């Protein structure tokens, strides 16, 4: 295996990220960018990359971490988030399912086919509300090239063509209360993200979520990784094909309302977060849950 020069690798990966930000105008001068910081490799690289990009453009950064309430798992990620934010001098806002919603993921996941369903809904909801409350112009997530391919294939397999509009390095404003999102690692392969953390001895959360193996994403990820080993370049070919056949216009025809219960943006009368909370409440009542 060829030896990798750390300085050359860092220059390559940060140049790619910088070019993506510049080419798509992901960040504008004087904006406040909220980084969704889980403590995993992708979100940590996103934080470091945007901190470096402040040498090129004048904008502000804040980080937001969300503790889903997964026993024996999440606290490692929170520690990594705290350490990286502190090292870079970036404010970290810590939120949790328990404080914001009244329960931990461990308390409710058995009500669903996959724990990823309530987790994704509440995590996105908390991130958006927190970013909105601090006046953030955009939320930067750590979605990498592999994540993007997986998401597209998941939507394709489910026939959910509406989500095709979410493919791309940015999501525009579609409602005043929805903070638009950007993906600085959109064209960066997951393996390179991992290599960056190793070469630079970065403190990250290494464990896989104990619930992730049950998801469709995990199965698609395994399929892609197995075939990438046999057919090198497969992922890049898929990504290039997506870029050729899709436009990145966020053509979301659904008109968003405000949830009748919480006031958050939704395409229905009641948002998914409130629907899930009602379901959890009903299940709790049927089992005579403790106060």
Which functions belong to the PLM regions below?
Residues 2-165, 187-200, 271:
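ATP-dependent adenylation/nucleotidyltransferase module used to activate substrates
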Residues 32, 54, 285-291:
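Long, charge-rich boundary regions
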Residues 92, 266, 278:
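Cys/His-rich microdomains that often coordinate metals
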Residues 116-129, 165-175, 228-244:
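Short, basic, helix/turn surface patches
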Residues 146-229, 234, 289-291:
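Catalytic subdomain that performs nucleotidyl-dependent activation
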Residues 244-255, 261-266:
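Short, flexible, mixed-charge glycine/proline-rich loop motifs
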Residues 258-262, 271-274:
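Short cysteine-rich clusters marking metal-coordination/redox-active sites
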Residues 273-285:
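Short Cys/His-rich micro-motifs in 6-15 aa windows
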């Amino acid at each position: 295996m060829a030896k990798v020069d750390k300085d050359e690798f860092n220059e390559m990966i940060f140049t790619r990220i910088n070019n993506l930000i510049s080419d798509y105008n992901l960040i504008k001068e004087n904006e406040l960018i909220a980084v969704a910081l889980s403590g995993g490799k992708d979100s940590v690289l996103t934080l470091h990359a945007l901190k470096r990009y402040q040498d090129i453009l004048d904008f502000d950064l804040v980080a937001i971490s969300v503790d889903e309430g997964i026993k024996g798992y999440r606290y490692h990620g929170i520690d990594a988030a705290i350490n990286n934010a502190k090292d870079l001098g970036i404010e970290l806002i810590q939120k949790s399912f328990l404080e914001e919603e009244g329960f931990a993921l461990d308390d409710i996941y058995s009500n669903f086919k996959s724990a990823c369903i309530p987790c994704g809904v509440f995590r996105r909801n908390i991130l958006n509300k927190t970013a909105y409350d601090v006046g953030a112009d955009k939320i930067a997530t750590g979605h990498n090239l592999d994540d993007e391919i997986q998401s597209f294939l998941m939507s394709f397999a489910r026939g959910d063509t509406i989500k095709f509009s979410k493919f791309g390095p940015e999501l525009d404003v579609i409602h005043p209360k929805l903070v638009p999102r950007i993906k600085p690692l959109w064209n960066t392969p997951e393996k390179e993200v991992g290599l960056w953390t190793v070469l630079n001895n970065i403190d990250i959360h290494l464990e896989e979520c104990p619930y992730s193996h049950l998801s469709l994403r995990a199965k698609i990820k395994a399929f892609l990784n197995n075939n990438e080993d046999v057919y090198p370049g497969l992922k890049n070919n898929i990504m290039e094909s997506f870029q050729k056949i899709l436009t990145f216009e966020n053509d979301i025809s659904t008109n968003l309302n405000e949830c009748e219960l919480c006031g958050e943006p939704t395409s229905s009368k009641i948002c998914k977060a409130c629907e899930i909370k009602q379901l959890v409440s009903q299940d709790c009542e049927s089992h005579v849950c403790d106060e």
